[in-house]
């Protein structure tokens, strides 16, 4: 079976502007010296990573902060492009990569539901049909008609996942944004993700909560120091990871 996510020999680099803040004078008065300092400096986010995800499979990316997990999700979601290698996906992708992503701070929660759901591929009529279910899932009550600039991080997470819960993706990508919600809402989100899995949705998931990873995922990709360290069954890789972190 052809994988629905193919992450092949992927490297992602970013320009690194060393001491750019303190170097403003040099940029103005000594531009040649400043550009020599800046030239060629790069930050390596991930290096030569490969993995595939089959249709209906749930895979977690784990690793320390800064290892390259979120970069990998952004590449699969198509938000960023690889420096080297290739990333291919097959089907509709729904992603929740950061709090407030796809939302406008001056619009109300209700208005942002229309905006975000449209970005995720729903037609306006479909959004209208699902609006009450989205609002009920969010547990935001009267705040749904307030501008989201007044929302807490937990409220933003609730709004974002509530929209996700009512779309019909082929691939679902979730970053560690659920960690900011309250415990009962987190449990509801995990239940929804597992329901997506039962429907055959492919899931790519980042979490530091190994219990959630064990409950949701078939396999785990362990990224360490920007490179692939291990890939295998959730049970085996989680045990290795816990031993390494002890």
UniProtKB/Swiss-Prot annotation:
Main subcellular localization, coarse class?
membrane
Q: Which Gene3D superfamilies match?
A: P-loop containing nucleotide triphosphate hydrolases (3.40.50.300)
One Pfam family, short name please? Answer: ABC_tran
The entry marks the following residues as binding ATP, namely 63-70
Query: Which stretches make up the ABC transporter domain?
Result: 22-246
UniProt keyword list: ATP-binding, Cell inner membrane, Cell membrane, Membrane, Nucleotide-binding, Polysaccharide transport, Sugar transport, Transport
Q: Which GO terms describe its cellular component?
A: plasma membrane
| Cross-referenced InterPro entries | AAA+_ATPase, ABC_transporter-like_ATP-bd, ABC_transporter-like_CS, ABC_transpr_TagH-like, Bact_Polysacc_Export_ATP-bd, P-loop_NTPase
* SUPFAM superfamilies named in the record: P-loop containing nucleoside triphosphate hydrolases
Q: Name one GO biological process term.
A: polysaccharide transport
Q: Name one GO molecular function term.
A: ABC-type transporter activity
The subcellular localization recorded is: Cell inner membrane
Would the keyword Membrane turn up in this protein's UniProt record? yes
**Record's bilayer topology term:** Peripheral membrane protein
> Which PROSITE patterns does the annotation name?
ABC_TRANSPORTER_1, ABC_TRANSPORTER_2
This protein's record includes keyword Membrane: yes
> What exactly does this protein do?
May form an ATP-driven O-antigen export apparatus, in association with RfbA.
The family note in this entry says:
Belongs to the ABC transporter superfamily.
What protein is this chain from?
A: O-antigen export system ATP-binding protein RfbB
